[in-house]
Amino acid sequence: MDQRLFFPATERNRVPIGDRLKTVLPARGVVLELASGSGEHAVAFQQRFPGLRWQASDPNPDHRTSINSWIRHAGLDHVMPHALDLESSNDHGTSPAMSRTI
């Protein structure tokens, strides 16, 4: 079952946001995105900036499910770690991608 959420604003603003991020992000490293929502931005930016490892997070379990669904849909399971719940002390990023280095 497809559990991806779609937020209309993402379609409109991912290119301008990505253009701005390109001017400030390093070529390599890890980015922690707070309150990632549907996960559409996280996946788009992971694809646009392959030298970075994009770590999505969201306190809403439905959003984390959507983020992980977007990651799977984009075929980024082995590149992007699963979404984190930064409000939970039990979530330690157990995704296999977490141990990869760039």
Give names to the regions the model predicted.
Residues 8, 36, 57-58:
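Conserved residues at beta->alpha junctions
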Residues 39-43:
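Glycine-rich SAM-binding Motif I of class I
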Residues 1-28:
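Class I SAM-dependent methyltransferase Rossmann-like catalytic core
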Residues 44-91:
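Class I SAM-dependent methyltransferase SAM/SAH-binding core
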